Amino acid sequence: IIRPANIMDGDYPGKGYEILETDAGKVLIINVMAIENHHFSKETLDNPYLVAERIIEEEGKNVDVILVDFHAEYTSDKHAMGFYLDGRADVVLGTHTHVPTSDPRVLPEGTLYVTDVGMCGNTDSVL
């Protein structure tokens, strides 16, 4: 289970990142959550920008692809994360709204970016 890497305390299952072996090479997947998320307090979540940056610095040299999943409510936060990690992460994907934004693009330093990739789940549901 990959859960937000910036949860500072509590006994939560999983970890905040994983390195997966694929036919294309090693992929580092990082999950971080914006501080405004209503399920956690500011005292519980560390700065997602700095946490993602730290993991990339520690693990990024050992992988072929770096993908960051940023769970946030506001599109402005997701855009900020994309620009913050541009050139350091290969892919930045926003998640939360359940509806894809259909705005894939390549940022100036080469990072692939989508504001929100939508939901993976039940199609016959209210969420």
Give residue spans per PLM region:
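Acidic, metal/ion-coordinating pockets
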Residues: 1-127
